[in-house]
Amino acid sequence: MPKHIVNVGDVELISLNDNLPIRSPFVAFPHTTIEQWNEYPELMADHENGYHRWGSLAIRSSGKLILVDTGMQGEGCYLLDDMKRKGIDREAVDIVVFTHVHPDHVGWNYTDGKPNFPNARFLVPQKDWDYWTKPENINTVEYVVPQVLPLKENGVMDLIDGEY
């Protein structure tokens, strides 16, 4: 079985990549030390920079194809190509679940205004929706308007309430 696939009972989990930028690990983990990172050389590109994986997860279960997060999109990003390479038809995605509404989680919803997952329902956390669609927040980041708002406008979004 390929390394990017794990089966748990009847559920198939497929690891998907969008990008593997090389940058300082302190961007995401500011309270760590270089000594701590050096204990994991497989995560380090060189003595100062680490691999910072952007990815998603596809889940096949009970006849459904679920995508957890849609990556970043942009320069160097390749989620749609990785899906194709791993045999996942983006038009077959039934449900997209967002863990949260950050650019590396909602970036491939649309390309040039066209949906990349045209047959999917999108599950969006209520708290994130409420926060990012407030008038004072909506234009503070460039991805909400082109990648998240059209989900509601096109009637393909369901809000999820509570903790998960």
Predicted regions and their residues:
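Intrinsically disordered, low-complexity boundary segments flanking structured domains
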Residues: M1-I5, Y110-T111, E142-V148
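Metallo-beta-lactamase
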Residues: I88, R121-Y164
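Conserved beta-strand hairpin/beta-sheet module of binuclear metal-dependent hydrolase folds
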Residues: P2-R85
